[in-house]
């Protein structure tokens, strides 16, 4: 519901501790409501025991940022082990795990489940619930910023000024609204679907030519 007022911020390999300094000062901006380090808009894939799930990263601010509730266990913290992960209810059900907290997943290394999150819709357009695994990642250069209602243009200007003050390079900061990125993703999905349908018809046509040729 907040995707139209959530900005995704990204910079290509900022120098030294510039990004950490930048994100640490975001809440000084009055128009900024909250922020979190997350790559929720560029999800990967996780596979174990022949079962696939979406994979993303998040930090200790991830759950409160999206207003998510823990069903079991605990959320991330700065003292969380490097292999700590959160999973959603759909993941637990799909994997048929009886006691998910402190359960160890083995796939490209080990992952320790520290908590279970309620199912939530990642993509507001498709509204689909999928098995999800969230890795602890507090150092991502992808940051989501929630802007107060009616303050988007002012907030963007102040964010750009803050980045320029810290890095000296205003152009190096990239940002999109979460809603806009969802729309781009779905347009790409529609293009792929149209191509699949087109090639299916071509295949049927060529098959028919072979039968009657």
Which role does the model predict for each range below?
Residues 1-57:
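Membrane-proximal extracellular/periplasmic loop immediately following the first transmembrane helix
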Residues 1-9, 69, 127-128, 138:
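Membrane-proximal juxtamembrane linkers immediately C-terminal to transmembrane helices
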Residues 9-14, 50-51, 75-82, 131-137, ...:
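Short, contiguous acidic/charged loop-to-helix segments that flank catalytic cores in large enzymes
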Residues 17-34, 89-93, 108-193:
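"Rare, low-scoring activations can occur
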Residues 37-40, 73, 175-178:
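Conserved beta-strand termini and adjacent loop/short-helix elements that scaffold enzyme active sites
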Residues 42, 97-102, 138-139:
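A short, compositionally biased
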Residues 52-130:
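Hydrophobic secondary-structure segments that place a key small or acidic residue at a functional site
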Residues 190-213:
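Hydrophobic alpha-helical transmembrane segments of multi-pass inner-membrane transport and secretion
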